[in-house]
């Protein structure tokens, strides 16, 4: 009888230790992601400040127009957008790594918290003229709630795809010269 009680006590202590380690891991992961998110938002503000120093007038942006047609400093603005996209990509990679770690043991609250951090970061991109991304991601998440690692990674991929389109529009690789993509009709 004493051995049975001893085994029960050992099992309870082992389970408590396992839960404590799991909670500690979640708290460390959450703190690391929040810190990374805050660092990224600060980098985006720094990028904006540097672009302002190069002549970009962010105040000229309208609700829908955030390009060089509504403000000065076209190349500096495009470079700022690309820098912000590159930095955001690094953050999204961290999110992916953490989601994969929690894939089997994570709960819906953890994935939703990671999604909220991604939304905060996406919203901060509006400071450099990358707008509308948050609304598109939120719209998609209404149909597919972010409660699993797979759905979180799908939302991350959606953000990356949309940022890729914005980055390509900046046309930085070609010396910053924007070209008119409208083809002329032959008569």
From Swiss-Prot:
Keywords noted in UniProt: Plasmid, Signal
Keyword Signal: yes
InterPro entries named in the record: Decorin-bd, Decorin-Binding, Decorin-db_sf
Coiled coil residues, start to end: none
Pfam families registered for this protein in UniProt: Decorin_bind
The UniProt record lists the keyword Signal: yes
Signal peptide region: 1-20
Family: Belongs to the decorin-binding protein family.
Task of the protein: Binds to decorin which may mediate the adherence of B.burgdorferi to collagen fibers in skin and other tissues.
Record's protein name: Decorin-binding protein B
Organism per entry: Borreliella burgdorferi (strain N40)
